[in-house]
Amino acid sequence: MQAVDNLTSAPGNTSLCTRDYKITQVLFPLLYTVLFFVGLITNGLAMRIFFQIRSKSNFIIFLKNTVISDLLMILTFPFKILSDAKLGTGPLRTFVCQVTSVIFYFTMYISISFLGLITIDRYQKTTRPFKTSNPKNLLGAKILSVVIWAFMFLLSLPNMILTNRQPRDKNVKKCSFLKSEFGLVWHEIVNYICQVIFWINFLIVIVCYTLITKELYRSYVRTRGVGKVPRKKVNVKVFIIIAVFFICFVPFHFARIPYTLSQTRDVFDCTAENTLFYVKESTLWLTSLNACLDPFIYFFLCKSFRNSLISMLKCPNSATSLSQDNRKKEQDGGDPNEETPM
């Protein structure tokens, strides 16, 4: 989505405004390398477990889409690492601008969208804890998931196609140099749309968690003195979603506003431009951290995922049998895919 940012230099006095290569070519590639290995292991394990869990609720459907999105994002990290570390050739940098950078932002906003849907689902679970999903609701969740993927794909595809200019030299410093005139216009349009996507989901998270907090407080007042400590612990787990959302996505979208201004208007001096660049890259790394934090959501909020993971760690060959046990419980009327009612 924001391919222009990844390999960019600031406008204006670009040749005079240099950056610390130890940060741009060493530190950030090392940080992304850590994320790559941690994310590949945790999300690969999550994918294996989710293949064994039936989609018996909207919650599970949204989680499965999230893990797919996270894995796609993680697979773009090696290209960014090589490009940022200046270890790649000209064709690699062109490939990053044209493909992997676009996929990175494509998956970021898919993850944001599904976190918003998961938040709505958790609010419904809080207010109506014993409501079960019916086939019609499940079909609606699947259709909505397909619509999100299709919409983001249609937004992203032109960014790939319209990055079609031949580089003037081997070292492509700005992805915008490779975009056609309409490609630059489309890129700007997509940026605005993605901003809208974020702020809509930001409002969803704020509103839903305000209502969830009120509902949990009412529940606490009603049961005060009864001593239901285990239940209180379960209630707290739901707040992991808002924690992940604010840690990973909020800083980047606030930092992005002044950074974009520094890229489009010559209103900052060199020191300010570099500071904004480092802040943008740091917060962009936090958005990538989401791929490593999402498995905590799966573990704490999805009982069948947690049970399967614990069983797999204790005995790798028992995961399949546990999946069969889960399906048997579902046939008997239980739903092991949901957390204990809040």
Curated annotation (Swiss-Prot):
It holds the Pfam family 7tm_1. Changing residue 175 to A: Abolishes ADP binding. One of its GO terms (molecular function) is G protein-coupled adenosine receptor activity. Residues 51-61, 119-142, 208-233, 299-342 are cytoplasmic. One of its GO terms (biological process) is positive regulation of microglial cell migration. PROSITE patterns: G_PROTEIN_RECEP_F1_2 (PS50262). GO terms for cellular component: cell body membrane; cell projection membrane; cell surface; membrane; plasma membrane. Keywords: Blood coagulation, Cell membrane, Disease variant, Disulfide bond, G-protein coupled receptor, Glycoprotein, Hemostasis, Membrane, Phosphoprotein, Receptor, Transducer, Transmembrane, Transmembrane helix. SUPFAM superfamilies: Family A G protein-coupled receptor-like (SSF81321). Residues 319-342 are annotated as: Disordered. PANTHER family: P2Y PURINOCEPTOR 12, P2Y PURINOCEPTOR-RELATED G-PROTEIN COUPLED RECEPTOR. Belongs to the G-protein coupled receptor 1 family. It is linked to Bleeding disorder, platelet-type, 8: A condition characterized by mild to moderate mucocutaneous bleeding, and excessive bleeding after surgery or trauma. The defect is due to severe impairment of platelet response to ADP resulting in defective platelet aggregation. This is P2Y purinoceptor 12. It comes from Homo sapiens (Human).
